[in-house]
Amino acid sequence: MKKIALVLIIFHLSLLTSLACTNFIVGKKASADGSVFVTYNADSYGSFMPLYHYPAAKHQPGEMRKITEWDTGKYLGKIAEAPETWNVIGNTNEWQLTIGETTFGGRHEMTDSTGIIDYGSLIYITLQRARTAREAIQVMTSLVEQYGYYSEGETFSIADPNEAWMLEMMGCGPNRTKSAERTVWVAVRIPDYAVAAHANQSRITRFLDGRYTPVKLKDLQKKYPVGGKKPVPNLVCYSDNVVKYARTMGWFSGKDAEFSYNAAYAAPDFSGRRYCEARVWSFFNRFADDFSKYVPYAAGIEKDAEPMPLWIIPNKKVSLQDLRDAMRDHYEGTPFALDKDGDIGGGIFQMPYRLSPLSYKHDGKEYFNERPISTFQTAWSFISQMRSWLPREIGGCFWFGNDDGNMVAYTPMYSCMTRLPKCFSGEGADDITFSMDNAFWVCNWVSNMVYPRYSMLFPSLKEVRDSLDQSYDRLQAQTEVRAQALEGDARVRFLTDYSCQKGDEMIDCWRQLAFHLIVKYNDCAVRPTDKQRRFERDQYGRGTRIKRPGMPEGYVKELLKLTGDRFLMPVEEKK
């Protein structure tokens, strides 16, 4: 989950786990139904990630909490526990507060190796302690000032049913004891009518040039309230030392109004633009009439190309399905598309993915692969839906998939639920233990059948995936009407049971899909099925004759350019 902007050698060493995550943010007036949305692809090779559940609890005075690094399990220290903590499902809590992240790395000397709070722990501790996005910003920044921030530079998506923010944070190096100098951070409120995104590259630039209305951290929950008489302006909140620290280190010498957070602390290089900002570009491109002016920036070739804005006003209202589609994106129909004529990088079956590492060398030259939003190494993917007009037990719907978003159906998990479906719990499985009852492993089993023979197998997966997505959409309204007729614990039990049932149904469906794929596509051939996906039998009761599709025409054309007449069939004279 890391993008380390260091020297080239360190960059290559980190490439397998770098350039890892993607987040999208949709304001309530930008969405089709008034929801606030946050999405998150958690991309990390080798990571096994279940759906997390932290039950609500009350804690004794003096109780301490052990902190272990989210990425590695390394013990970092202890912090004081809060008197009361909230129920957390995945990256959302019972108040519909949602937090996502992407790592941008930044200047390596800013990492605080003596800190106790890493970025993952910061997310889940905050979800247990905060109820709104603004409270979350206060909790997160106070925790790292008190205990130190152990991780590299992060961009956080922080949202509740009423508003969304983007927070960027970095440490100030090790052995800092004066709390006001332990981190540098800035938080920007995303306008209600806008969409935003981040993908492992710091995105906040100038914020003291008059475009934003500053608000002090202590006043964040009191001033410019949501739902007040006046519209909420474009707010910014930042640490007192955010500019001073850059001046002290010699990284900035201009006027405060000229200060850019990412220019000072995490300036985008080629990899930050082509691998990271290009994903943001692809998301924005879906909701803009013409976003081609920013192609040179996203491509990373032109050093002085105009950078993209932090957020845009979409040209249409954004729906849940729009976000599913965006999470499954491979740059289709864009200059970065992976399915262009002549590109055989996806193999015989035109896989819209490229093998890692992202760069490789040949004959003394270095080359690179595109890095799309949808990628092999996604451990889980979610779309968090937050709705202010519904009771909070119902309003928070956490659409969850335990693999690459392109290869899963997003299954509804309500944020009030008090237990998990077994398939998402991690029970009986880990990163090196396969289980037929575990969604991570069953979904990865299916996707890893599909990847190498994408154009052949993916249509079968897509049919099942889309059918499940559509069934969940059809059931959502009637399920929530039934939930509104209930109260208190009965409502929570109903939505818990519903969520667990959908999880159980999903994994059963995916197991059946796995069985179907191995039979239908065995030996790189295709067994015919009827419209109900049932295998056909001949008059003797055996499966009907298989079909051998051969190689796609586009691949044949490129192959023959390489092989010439080597495999040209000789013309034999007829006798």
Residue ranges with predicted function:
Residues 16-20:
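Sec/Tat signal peptide C-region and signal peptidase I cleavage site
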Residues 5-15:
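Bacterial N-terminal signal peptides
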Residues 111-113, 121-130:
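Second-shell loop/turn segments in exported
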Residues 344-485:
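Substrate-recognition/cap regions that form aromatic- and gly/pro-loop-enriched pockets
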Residues 467-575:
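Histidine-centered catalytic/metal-binding microenvironments
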